[in-house]
Each structure stands twice: as structure tokens, then as C-alpha cells.
Amino acid sequence: MGVKKKKEMQVAVLTICHQDLETLKSFADAEGKNLASLLLRCVQLTDGVSQIHYVKQIVPLLEKVGKNGVCDPTIQSCLDILAGIYLSLSLKNPLKKVLASSLNSLPDFFLPEAVHRFTSRLQEELNTTDLYSYRKVIDNISSCMENFNLGRAGVNNLLKNVLHFLQKSLIEIVEENRKCAGNHIIQTQLMNDLLVGIRVSMTLVQKVQDFQGNLWKASNSPIWQNMCGLLSIFTKFLSDDDLLQTVQSTSGLAITLFIKTMFHPSEKIPHLISSVLLRSVDCTSVPEWFMNSCRSLCCGNVSGSAVLFLCQGTLAMLDWQNGSMGRSGEALLLDTAHVLFTLSSQIKEPTLEMFLSRIMASWTNSAIQVLESSSPSLRDSLNGNSSIVGRLLEYVYTHWEHPLDALRHQTKIMFKNLLQMHRLTVEGAVLVPDPFFVKLTESLLRLEWHIKGKYMCLGCLVECIGIEHILAIDKTIPSQILEVMGDQSLVPYASDLLETMFKNHKSHLKSQTAESSWIDQWHETWVSPLLFILCEGNLDQKSYVIDYYLPKLLSYSPESLQYMVKILQTSIDAKTGQEQSFPSLGSCNSRGALGALMACLRIARAHGHLQSATDTWENLVSGARIKQGLIHQHCQVRIDTLGLLCESNRSTEIVSMEEMQWIQFFITYNLNSQSPGVRQQICSLLKKLFCRIQESSQVLYKLEQNKSKHEPEKELTKQHPSVSLQQYKNFMSSICNSLFEALFPGSSYSTRFSALTILGSIAEVFHVPEGRIYTVYQLNHDIDVGRFQALMECFTSTFEDVKMLAFDLLMKLSKTAVHFQDSEKLQGLFQAALALSTSTKPYDCVTASYLLNFLIWQDALPSSLSVYLTQQVARGDGDRPASVVERNTLMVIKCLMENLEEEVYQAENSLLQAAASFPMYGRVHCITGALQKLSLNSLQLVSEWRPVVEKLLLMSYRLSTVVSPVIQSSSPEGLIPMDTDSESASRLQMILNEIQPRDTNDYFNQAKILKEHDSFDMKDLNASVVNIDISTEIKGKEVKTCDVTAQMVLVCCWRSMKEVALLLGTLCQLLPMQPVPESSDGLLTVEQVKEIGDYFKQHLLQSRHRGAFELAYTGFVKLTEVLNRCPNVSLQKLPEQWLWSVLEEIKCSDPSSKLCATRRSAGIPFYIQALLASEPKKGKMDLLKITMKELISLAGPTDDLQSTVPQVHALNILRALFRDTRLGENIIPYVADGAKAAILGFTSPVWAVRNSSTLLFSALITRIFGVKRAKDELSKTNRMTGREFFSRFPELYPFLLKQLETVANAVDSDMGEPNRHPSMFLLLLVLERLYPSPMDGTSSALSMGPFVPFIMRCGHSPVYHSREMAARALVPFVMIDHIPNTIRTLLATLPSCTDQCFRQNRIHGTLLQVFHLLQAYSDSKHRTNSDFQHELTDITVCTKAKLWLAKRQNPCLVTRAVYIDILFLLTCCLNKSVKDNQPVLESLGLWEEVRGIISGSELITGFPCAFKAPGLPQYLESLTRLTIAAVWAAAAKSGERERDVPISFSQLLESAFPEVRSLTLEALLEKFLSAASGLGENGLPPLLCNMEEKFLLLAMKENHPECFCKILKILHCMDPGEWLPQTEHCVHLTPKEFLIWTMDVASNERSEIQSVALRLASKVISHHMQTCVENRELIAAELKQWVQLVILSCEDHLPTESRLAVVEVLTSTAPLFLTNPHPILELQDTLALWKCVLTLLQSEEQAVRDAATETVTTAMSQENTCQSTEFAFCQVDASIALALALAVLCDLLQQWNQLASGLPILLRWLLGDSDDLVVCVESLHQVEEDYLFEKAEVNFWAETLIFVKYLCKHLFCLLSKSGWRLPSPEMLCHLQRMVSEQCRLLSQLFRELPPAAEFVKTVEFTRLRIQEERTLACLKLLAFLEGKEGEDTLVLSVWDSSAEARQLTLPRTEAAC
């Protein structure tokens, strides 16, 4: 947020040759006043900026000399030297422009001489013959033409020579480019030179005066000949595909420009160019020079790209303004359009598509220019209804969703221009009723809002015709647009459209209304929907609206802020019962109004719409509201409130004392946020605040220094600057105290991450002073031993983010290690790091790496390490003394390598011993970490590093050789049995030999038979195996028990491979290479690089373990990136050679190949990915093109079994390449061929091919339609129109159509066994993602219509799932308006009941299609009600004609079910269309037919005994749904409750089928819930009254879990007072016995039933407590049982649902059991329930914590507790809810007068369970387990010591305020003895820990530290109770905190916390 320093100008120094220098010296005068002296002084300077000052003095000096100096040899020589200087300067050197500007002011009398001198110097430049100097000459010619008079005159004089030079240079550069094929670096440079040469040629033609006349046009003129030569060169460039497309496109521009310049007469130019574009040149009618220069354009086959670039030249280089080319120009314009349309259907290469879109946009610009003065015929050709505009609109609609942003932007320009074109053609007419605009508007509004192009086009339309016409069509458009702002991909488009609309609307309203009343209408339209979203929208929606839309609205209309604040304040007041809530802002219990208020104020302040912070707090929002916002339950409210405090549009605005207090309050409760996004925002906002403090402190400091009475800032008048500075210092110190305290033992990852990030920001913002800059605070001053130790202990975190942040923070501080650690401690740290580097826990080596790097950079290594340095290095003498860091790094790496060498040697003897005792990957990781921190390009000890690098490479290869057999085996994951019995170790020799990579791909031909143990020939095996046996242990020389698991061996091996790969990649990436072997520079030789490449190739192509080859890929990518940038040509060509080699190997693959064809080809795709992804993207991507061609050829279907393996490899590699985002749009041209290969491969008889094809197809679906962004598989965000799809992939249109036709024909055939056609599955998967757009034109070239009949026929498939897919795929292919007719057609194809022969599969498929079409029609929005009802009536009549399919006449239950579903859907649609009146249904007789179906169904008659048939559950569910609808319909008739009801709910509930009971109960539950919540309009329907008895009976006998659960839910919804008295009569259980039964269910059933039963039991308990006040003691035992049930149900291991149920129960019973002024439960039980609340508040599940905060809110909002805190009735976050809960509990203990009884219990909470210390002891003494990744219950949110801190603090507050004292000391004797014993045991355990225990025994050390803090807290409280501490001493926490002390002094916070 601070002001950035202006970057200093870099100016290269000008120099001159020795001869010129001597000339200047000879002419310089003694006084130093002549021009030679001035130039001499200038060139002798070493600072370019100072030289500028001298250059500016040249002309004034010459002006003084006057005319007399014209003949002065000194002046002449100086002018000559100046010309040389100008031409020697680089193009970008500011001195060049300064010199040109100065010489432009040269007196006229010096000009001839200056031009002469300049011309001669330029001639010398043009004579150069060095090809690599051509670029400098071309740059000089270019600069001469740019505002430099002398340069232009010189070029004019030498025009012939200049043109000749350009011609020669272009020819030679192209030739050199061909010679350097393969050298990317040189070729890129040459291409750039070529491009500049063409541009300079064009500049010459446009700017040189000679070209304005006709003298040069003589055919024998040298200039003319050179021009013809250049034109010929440009023509060749245009068609040369070896050149970059930018060169070709610029050549197209140059050709048009040269033709325009050279052709005569100019009137014929349009006709000539038109004939060239249309390829219809009459060779006899064009000049000879044109034929000679452009023969290939006239007679040859011109490529599409060449024509495209000629179109670009035509539009860019010809003069279209004012119709200067006349009718021929208009004809050329139309011809160009038709050529572009033709090209658009041919060009599919991404870069050419981009060119095409730009050129088409350019065409529309040219058309506008021509239309401004055009003929009527052209206007007719270009109006909105013309074919050309129609084609252009189709192009826009096809490409407005294109993945390339730049292309989408061009479609916007085109659309905007098309609107302008139409306006010009109808000039003078009224725009809004214009049919073209009206039709366009309606079409756009019909589109779904997920289409990005809709926003862009609507925005253009609003700018063209205004918003009022659009709002007249639909007033809800602003709300509709805001609704979609939850989708991040649409947010920028939606906010831009809204901005365009509200600006246009405001302007319109202002112009229409003279009064100010218009603002109310504007607010209603644009602000009210915004406020609704801010209050009621989902989190994403609200966040995006705040970030994108709100700032735009407030910036445009700042006055709206007051309106918004007023509305929101009213809504917040209504929430607390002061006023009625505004309906638009939702219910009174919504979170929104406060959050919306904070968001509005935050944006307003950040954008400068608030005068000052003080005004905000005093006038707009109270301090209480700020605090509520800072601890609000919803994170966005907290973020917005913090943003309000931190952000300001003025970086120097003073931070007020109130703001600082609120920030401190915020930090106390908000560090432990689990959301990464929230953490990032908190840290970012606080950094902004720190920047404000730093910058405003500069202002205050200056004011204090100057003692100025004039204070520019209003805030400064309130107090003296020194006071504010002191406040700043205290505040920052307090913040740092809080942050360091947050690093306590056991603090969560979130807390540590937040605290360290904020501390890092503080260290960065308040850096150590430099120069005179004042720093108000320095973090260094607040670092002590304890804080240093806390930062060091962060290295032990299992999260690397925390380690990295701690390391970075320590690096920002001064040398802390030396200050706070003695040498013995440092030695211990180093030894701990070495020990951790060989730990079997993978994360330990990361800790070791950070520890070692810390010791290296702090120069805190043990002195003993110096033995690893030579004497010379150790002394540090020599010309270039090595840096301390380099020396330390070298020592550590040598030490690690020495250890590693010994361990590799041991691993060669026993890999198992290595895996169990010293896995080697940790050492390698530490070496890589040390190298990455060092700047390897500027090493000083090169001679020392060379042998180290060489040894490191050899060591890596050795290590890899040891572990590779495991990784390269065919089954690396399960090689060693999970035995911990050491006796089985003798068998491991055989296993390790067996795993050698001798496996092949012969599984295609035969199954692999494992040899019997007896027949193993160990000698044969050993002959091919590296010596990796465990003979040392087995043969008895040194028998060592070693428990090894497969997991340990595998982890050791694949991680070792991973680390070696990363090390090698790092070495290649960071180490400088030796240009030649003898060179003294560089550390890596060419041979070493090649060896590394071979290593990666071997392991990527042979490794089977994914972890190994994925990380090898990461290292290999680093190598390939380096090679492609390497100037060494042999290295640069290595990736290409490797690629050809592996492709050849794949092509030759057979079943005996060692390339892995299982595991998705293992590392092979990664290998090829790395080679292709590193290819320079700016080049032609030749490697990608050739590779894709080869792979697609291999992936195609083949009859040769020998080609199966290559086909599998090709499919797997293609999948990887299509998934690689780095290839971007370059891969798109191959998508169609890839899809063909996948679809055809899916029909292969070989399983492996089908499997790989499926994976490839999945990758292609993602590549085409995007990453899935919604739960719905067919989400609209992952679909596209058929036109867009087939325009992007036109080859797929005939392919898919043909394939679909083949499949449909086969499905319909009546011959033999049904063909299931696997490819149908893939075809339908693609087609169901397409849909027709209302914007599709009438063109039938890519129509989706031909697909429809084939998809319908696919619905006849014998495969059930295929029929479903066909039905779903059909829906998007049928336009909404055509659906009714299609449904009627489908229904007509169904058989009649009299037909003798019919196929149920066909019937089923047809019915499914009808159902899905009807569903889509009912969901559609854009239709009128009357049309809808009419169409549905027709469909109903057709449906009734085939009603036999729903009756018993149809023997198939599956088709009956679907037909019944259609009937059910029809009843729903018709009901909806007439708003619940049913005359249509009755008049059609549909209900009567439905009742007939139900009466004749098995629901009435029952099924035969043990009846089973396919589709029975589905049929029952469909029939039940229809029956329930019929019952409700009959019951809805007033006064006719059960008339015509064929079956009652009671009968349905007694059905033997759970499907029937479940659906019935679901329907009833919905009604009961609606009645219970008050949402039902008329309460409970009469049909459901008096059903209590039925539900009780059902509850007792129901044995289906789902039904049982719903019955309990219904009972829970009902009033217990109504049904509980009936239990004895109905189920022979007294209410008390029923309660016991309910609790038994809650104790024993599975989780969902348990949760419902617990809720029901709690409701029954509450009922008993409230109605039987006198007889409460009768259920005391049950009450205790219930309490225990609640306690057991909130344990962490239980499902979330169970704990949420407990929270709900506690919330509902809180007034009764938790906060009752007269407690019902015993104190122990009451406190046990409170402990449940506290436990749930510390749950790791966010949902559970949030729900538990509702319990706390309820508890602290009761009449007797609302004064305990300042946050009664507020929604708070769990972090502060924990503190508030304890505050309320302590207050209640005092109210109940139960402090004496409650205190021992609370002290036990403080001390923890007795088991905690037992765990500490056991963990310290147990032997470390061999299992690496044990899954244990870990809570990453709860922080034990935070709970201890809050509890301790509130107990102290309670005891000190109440003045309470122990009645008798004996009460706590037992506790005191326990605490004392615990202290003694802790002390003993600490002594048993090894040195540096925090690193080597982290878990045990942390447990002990936590227990120690708990014990200390308990001791302090006991001491306070005994009176050993003064009553005025208030101990706030386990660790004394001045920050907390200040916290309590904040107004009203004392009670809150």
C-alpha cells in the first residue's frame, strides 16, 4: 500500500573509437570552451545520465558559434563524430533520442554539412557484411525515420543503397535461418531480425518523400528494381511455412502496401487485390513486374494462411475512409468478407484462428468507415437483415464462448461494430422499435445466463439502444444477473454488464425527469437487489458481489451509500426487536444485514467515499457493531469488518486508538481459521494496516521534527505527534506479544500459519532503518530467548508451510542464533538435524533440511565441521574470499555426502536394514535444500565445488541402482510380507531377488505362472541381480533383529528415487555449465548433462511406482527447460533426439518389451510430456506436430495383435498430453483425431485398449467442455452449443453422425444375439453435452437435426443404461418449442393393447425419452401459460390413448413404472399451470383414469406370495408417488375429505413393501415439518389429524431402518402433549417406559436413527420437565441416563450427524438445563452438559462448531444471563464462543451459589484427565512403531492451552470479583496432592528427554509441555485460593500476557472474554 519508489533510469554510456577520441583531443581548446572540448568531456564520463546533460549543450554552443563555424574543421569533425555516436548507440538507449532531439534544433547554416557527414557515416553502416550486425543497421535506419531530420535526409540521399541493403539482408537472414535449423535461440533472434527488416521496409515506403512522386517508377530505376525485389521477397515469405506467422502476416501487410505504392492507375488497385484474394487473376492483364514479383499469388496454389494475411493487408493498408476507393472499393470490401467466411470454415489452428478473428473485427471497422459515405446498394448489403451480417453474427455466436480470451474480445468488437453498421444503414429511423434490434434483444434474453457471450452482447446492445427497452421486457434482469455471481467464471462479465446497465439507466432517468424522484426508482432497480444478495446470498455470491460489483456502484453513485446504510441499520435494529424487518432483507435471524453494512462501509472507505474514519464510527456505525462484526459467526462478515478498519484510500491516514484496540481484539480470536482463503485475506489486510502505520508514522515523525503548527491532516489536531507515535509503538509491541503467544505448545496449524505470516509482514514492513528513514517499530527489539525458541520449534511442525514461514522470519531478523544459543546448544541442534535426516518418518527430513539451512545462514555451525574444508578455504585468503554462506554450505554438503556414502555402502549389502534404520532419502533431501538456498551462479570456490558435484552425481547413481529394483518391479507395492517376526527375515533374500525387473508385457499373450518355491534356481537369479542381499545379517557375522514391512521398503525406495530426481533436476537448473571441458567457468560438463538425461530416460521408462516416476518427471522437466535455453547446439538438440528414440521404441514395442504397458504406461507419458512441454511456445511447435501425428496413427484401430502394445502406449500418452495445460491451445487441433481414436478403441476386443481408450475419452471430455464445475454431471457450465462444438471440431460432425447411424441401425436389427455396441456409450456421452442455441441461424451445414432420429433409435438398445443415456441426450437436441410435437410423435410409435408382438426395450426407451422431454418442457421458463396449458392438454390426450401401458395388461413392471412417472409429471405440470385448481385435469378425466389405475393395481389387490420381478422397487415407488398425489388431490376438495380416494395413508403405511412405506412417510413428514415450522398455509391437513396412534404402533413394529427413522422424525415434529398420553393405550408403554425405550434406541441403533431418537428423547424429557413439575423426581434416573446419553453422543469418533443432533438437543434444552435460574439437574450433571458444549465448540468439524455457537448464543441470551457478556443475541464465531461460554458458566455458578461445589470440577477440567499424563509416560518409554502412516484421531482445530487459558482467566475473574474464599482448605487437599505429584512426575520426564528433544522427540515433548502448562495454571489458582497471591493480582493465563491485560481494559470486553 506504500508509495513505490520511482525506478531509476538506466542509461548505457556512449563511447567512441580511439581514432575519434584522438581527433577530439587534437581539436580541444585549452580553455575547454569549444565543441570538441565539450564532446571530449562527455565521452570521458562513466555515467550515461550525466552525458545527457552534455549532449543538451551541443546546439546552444553551435548557436553561439554562428555562421562563421560552418567552415571550421573542428566543427566539421565534431559533426562527423556526432553522426558516428548516433549510429553507434543502441535503439533503446535514451541518449539516442536526446541526441536526435538536440540535432533537430541545429541552426540551418550547419544543416548541409551535418547531412553530408551523417550520410557518409550511414553509407559506411550500409556497407557492413557481417550478418549478425545487420540488425543494428536496420535499427539505425528505423531510428533515422523517427522524428530525426538529419536521419531522414540521410536515408533520402541513400534511398537506393538502403533498399538494396534491406533486400540483401532479408535474403541472407532467411538463408542463415535455414542453416541454423534446430538452434532455437539463434533462430528466434533471426526471426526477430527478419520481422524488423520487413517493418522498416514498410516504414521507408510510408515516410520517404521520394515515393510520393513518379520519377522512381521507371523500370530501369535502381529504386524500382529494389522495390520489385523486396516485393518478390515478401511474396516468398508469405508462403513460407518455415517462418513464424508474425513474419508471414507482416509480409502480407507489406505486399499490399507495396502494390498500393507501385501500381498505376490507383483506381484499379481494388480490382487487382480482389482478383488476388479470389484467386482469379487474369495473368494477361496485369503488368509484367507484378507477375514477376507475385507469380505465386497469381498462378500458384495459395495457402489459406497466405490469403488470410493478404486480407489483413487489404484492410490495414488501403484507405477506406470516406469511400475514397468508390464502387470498386465497396466491391472489394464485400469480396473480402466472403473470402474471410470461407477461411473461417477451413482454419482450425489456434494462432490462425486468432488472426482470423482480429481480421474479421478489422473488416467491421473498415465497413463502418465505408458506410459513412456509401452507396444505397452497399447499405442494403450490410444492414442487420443482410446475409453478410447474418454470417458475422453466426461467427460471433459460435466463438463468444471460445477458450481464448483474446478471441472472445474480438467477437465483442465485431458485435459492437455490427450494431453500429446497422444504425448507419437505418440512419434517421427510431432505433428501439427497429425489428432487427427487437429480435436481437429477445433472442439474447432467451439464452441461459451461463453463456458468457450473452453478457458481452447485452452490454453492447445497452450502449446502442439504451436499457429502458430491456427493462420493459423483464424488470428482474438485475436480480437475475446478481444471482449468477456465485460462479467465479461469470463474475467479471456479470459485473461489467451491470455497470453498463446502471450507468445507462441513470443517464436515461436524469434526462427524462427534472425532479430528484428518479433516484428512488434507480435505487429500487439496482441497489435493492444488491442489498438482498449481500444479506441473503451464499458466501461465494456475496464475496464476488463485494469484490466486483459494489465498488463499481459506489464509485459511480457515492450518494447511494447513505441510502444503503439507512436500510441496513433499520434491518439490524429489527433483528433485535426494535422495528419490523424489511421483507427484502430476509428473515430477522439471517446473518446478512450486519455483514452487508460492513461490506458497504469497507468498500466506501477503501475507495475514498468516507471523509475519515472518525466520521464513520461516529455517524454510520457504532463501536458495538464493529466488535460484533469482528467476531461474527460468518467469516465474510469478519473479513469485511477487518477490511473496514485496515483499508483506506490514503496510505498515510492515521490509525486511531479505537481502531488499534479493535484490531487487537480481532487478532485474539481470529488466528485459528481453517479456511486458507480467510487466512490469506486476514494476513493481507493486516499488512495493509501495518503499511499505513509505517507511512503515517513518517508523516508524524516529520511533523514532530519540524515542530510545525500547520497540520495537513484533520486527525493530527487531536493529539501531539509524539503521543500517536508512542501509541503506534505500544500497539505493534502488543500485536507481536499476541502473535508470539499464539506459537504456544500444541497450537494448531492455522494459528501458527496466521501468526507467522503476520509476523513476517511486520518484519518486512518495519524493516531496519536505512539512511534517514524513521521506523516506528522494530521486531528485533522484541525478540528474546523464549520467542527465538518458539520460532525454532515451528520447524517441528508436520506442515512445511509453517517451517518455511518460521525460517523466512528468522532470516529477516538479525543473527539470532548466535545471540540466544551457546556452542553446546548449537552442536546439539546440528546433531539433531543429522539424526532427523535419517529418520524413517518422511517429514523429519524436511525439518532437518530447514534446521541445517538455518545453521548455515546464521553461521552457527559447530567448529568441528571445518575439517571438511581445505586449509586455503578455511583461512579465507585469495583474491576472491568465499562468502560465509557458501563456505558453510560446502561444509554441510560434504558432511552429508560422507554419511550418505557410508549408508549407501551398507544399503548395497542390506536394503532391508537401510529401510528400517537409515532410509537415505533424507540425506539427499537436505543436500538439495542446501543447494536451492545458495546462489549457484556466483560461486567463488569453483575448484572446491567441481569434485563435490562430480561425487554427488556418482553417489546419486549408486543410490538409484540400490533402490531401482523395487521401483522397476511389476508390483512394487506388495513385495515384502507385512511380517514383524524377525524369523521370517531369511525369506526376504529370495523375495528381493524375485523382484528384479525381468517382467515383460507378455500378459497380452498368456497368463504369468509363478514358479514353485522348490523349483527356484537361485543361481540363475543371482546372475542377473545387483548385489543387494542381506547376507551380512543372515550369515551370522552381525545378526541384528530388524522388523521390516513392505511399506517401509517401498517408502525408502520410491522416496530415494524421488529425491535423487529432484537433486539432479536442481543441479541442472541451478549450476552453470562449462562451455568447453577446459573452461574455468561452470560446474556441469556436457557429458554430465547427457548422463543425467540418460538416467531420467531409464527411470521414467522403466519405473512402475507412480511416486517415483512422477517426481522423476519433475526433475526431468527442469533438465529439459535448461536444455532448450542452452546455447550449446548439441545439448539443445538432445530433447529432440530422445523423443525420436522413445517414439521408435514405442512403435517397435511387442509383448517382450520392457516398456510398461500396464499402470497407464507408467512413466512413458510423463517422459514425452516433459520433452514436448519444454518446446519453445513461440516457435512452430514442430516436435508436438510430428509426435501427435505419430501417436494418433498408432492409436487407431488395428487388426494386427503385434500392434496392440504400441496402441495402448499411444492412447495413454495422448491422454497425458491432452491433460497437460502447458500445451494450451496448441493441442486443440488434435482433439478431433483423439476423440476418433478413443471411440474406435472402445470397440477393441483387447481389454487394455478399451481401458486406455476410456481414460483418453475422459481426458478429452474435460479438455473440450472444461473441468466439472458443478455436482450435476451435465451442468450447463460444462456444455456447449452444437454449432460451437462442430465449428471447433468439424471433422467430428460426419464421424459422429456416421458412427451413430451404424449403432442405431445395429440396435434396430432383428437378427441374432443383440449387439450391445460399447461405442454407443461414448457417442451419447458427447452428444448429451451439446444443445441447440436460440442464436443458431438457418444454415443447415452443421445442423443438429440429423442426429435426432438416430438418438431416438438408440433408445431401443438392449442395455438399460444406454436407453437412459439416449433419453438424456435427446433433450438438448430438441428446441423447447418443438418438444410437444416430438412427444406426440414418440407416443404415437407406442404399441396398442391389441398389438400381438412388441418389444419392451423399445417401449421403455421411448417412454424414457417422453419423460425427459416432458420434464425439460415443464422446467423451461420462456413460454406463456396459455400455450403451455394447451400443449399439455394435447399431450395428455395422446397419453390417455396408450394408458394400457400403466395397467396390468402390460406385464413389464419397468415400462409400467416409467408410464406412471409420465402421468405423475403431467398431473404436476397441469396443477402448476392452473395454480392448484384442477378443472383441466377433471375435464380431461385424467384423475378418474389415475384412480382406475390405482384401484386395479397391486397396492389394492396385493402381489402373489413371494412375487419377484425385474423393476419391482421402481414400479412400487412410481405407483406410490402417483397414489399420494391422487390422495392429496382428492383431499384438496373442500368438504370431500375422503371421497374418491382409492386408498388411504393408513393402508399405504401398512404395505408390506418398505419402498411404499418410505415414500408415504416422506410425504407425511414434509407436511408435519411444514406445519411445525409455520410455513404451511392452513396448518396440518385434516387427513393427517388423529394419526398419533398409527405412528406409535408403526414405531413399535417397524424394522426397516429408513422407515423407522422417518417415523421417529414425524413423532419429533408432533407435540408430545398430543401423543404421549396415548402410549399406554396404544403400545402398552407408560410415558416413562416410552422415554426409556427411546433412549435405548438412541443408545443402540446406527447413527442416523440414533440422532433422531436422541432428539425425540430430549423433546420427551423437556415435556416431562415442563408439565410434571411436582413429580420430577420420579424420572430422576431417566434424567441421569439421558445426560449420559448426551455425553456419549458428542465424542469425536462419532459421525458428524450424531454430534449435530447433540448440539440441537443442547440448544433446545439450554433454557431448561443449562441456564435455568433454579437448576433441575444435579450440579455434576449440569456441568457435564456444559462440558459437552465446550467439547463441541472445539470440534474439528466446522458445521459442529457453528451449531455449538448457537447453543452458546441461546445460553447467553436468557433473561438471567444476557448481562454476563456484551454479545447477547449476537451470532459469534466458535473461537470467542468458547470464552463466552466459560464466562456465562462462571456467572451461573455465582448465581446458583454453587461455587464451592463447582470449583473442584472446573479445576479438574483445567488439569485435564488423569489419562493425559499416563499417555505422556507411555509415549516416552515405548519402542517406536515400524508402521509409517498410522491413522489416528487428530483434531487440527482444537487447542488445549487456549481452553486452559480462557478457563483460568475466567476463574480468576470470578474469584477476585466475588471475593469468595474456601470454606475449608480440606476441600482441595486431594487436588493439591494430585497437582504436586504431577509436577514431580513431569520434572522427572523432562530430565529423561534427550538433548534437542523438541526436534527428535517432538510429540512427547509437546505433550509434556502442554501438561506442564496445565499443571502450572492449576498451581497458580490453588495458590490464589490459599491466599498466597494478593487479591489484587490477576493472573490472566498460563503465560503472563501484557496484551491480555490491555485486552481487559477495553470497554465492555472484560465480561465478554
UniProtKB/Swiss-Prot annotation:
**What keywords is this UniProt entry annotated with?**
Coiled coil, Phosphoprotein, tRNA processing
Q: Which residues form a coiled coil?
A: 888-918
Q: Which GO terms describe its biological process?
A: tRNA nucleoside ribose methylation
Query: Keyword Coiled coil: yes or no?
Result: yes
Instruction: Specify the superkingdom.
Output: Eukaryota
- GO annotations of cellular component type: cytosol
Q: Which InterPro entries match?
A: ARM-type_fold, THADA-like_TPR, THADA-like_TPR_C, THADA/TRM732_DUF2428, tRNA_methyltransferase_THADA
According to the UniProt record, list the residues that bear Phosphoserine: 1015, 1024, 1161
User: Per the record's keyword annotation, is Flavoprotein included, yes or no?
Assistant: no
Q: Name one Pfam family in it.
A: DUF2428
The UniProt family comment states: Belongs to the THADA family.
Q: What does this protein do?
A: Together with methyltransferase FTSJ1, methylates the 2'-O-ribose of nucleotides at position 32 of the anticodon loop of substrate tRNAs.
The protein, known as: tRNA (32-2'-O)-methyltransferase regulator THADA
Lineage of the organism: Eukaryota, Metazoa, Chordata, Craniata, Vertebrata
The record's gene field reads THADA
